Amino acid sequence: MEQAPADQGPQREPHNEWTLELLEELKQEAVRHFPRIWLHSLGQHIYETYGDTWEGVEAIIRSLQQLLFIHFRIGCQHSRIGITRQRRARNGSSRS
């Protein structure tokens, strides 16, 4: 009878530790792009909704990821990621 191979992959850190590190990185990035009062309000809303639970941690991670993604996609001034605005030719011609 065949047996599954022994796990020979790299040692992984515990999920909880990885999740908290991800949250910390997202918070540091969010502070660079959004007013602290907005982030504080978001944190308060999550805390009031979920309390001090892992579900709350996951909710704030999702929210910060979505906010940062949209922020970069719209065109953050600090990022090369995002929608590039086409400059119109000075002679008034259009490429449409």
Curated annotation (Swiss-Prot):
Q: Which GO terms describe its cellular component?
A: host cell; host cell nucleus; host extracellular space; virion component
Region feature (Homooligomerization):
1-42
| UniProt-recorded name of the protein | Protein Vpr
Q: Does the keyword Transcription apply?
A: yes
Biological process according to GO: DNA-templated transcription; monoatomic ion transmembrane transport; protein homooligomerization; regulation of DNA-templated transcription; symbiont entry into host cell; symbiont-mediated activation of host apoptosis; symbiont-mediated arrest of host cell cycle during G2/M transition; viral penetration into host nucleus
Checking Pfam families in the record gives: VPR
Subunit-structure text: Homooligomer, may form homodimer. Interacts with p6-gag region of the Pr55 Gag precursor protein through a (Leu-X-X)4 motif near the C-terminus of the P6gag protein. Interacts with host UNG. May interact with host RAD23A/HHR23A. Interacts with host VPRBP/DCAF1, leading to hijack the CUL4A-RBX1-DDB1-DCAF1/VPRBP complex, mediating ubiquitination of host proteins such as TERT and ZGPAT and arrest of the cell cycle in G2 phase.
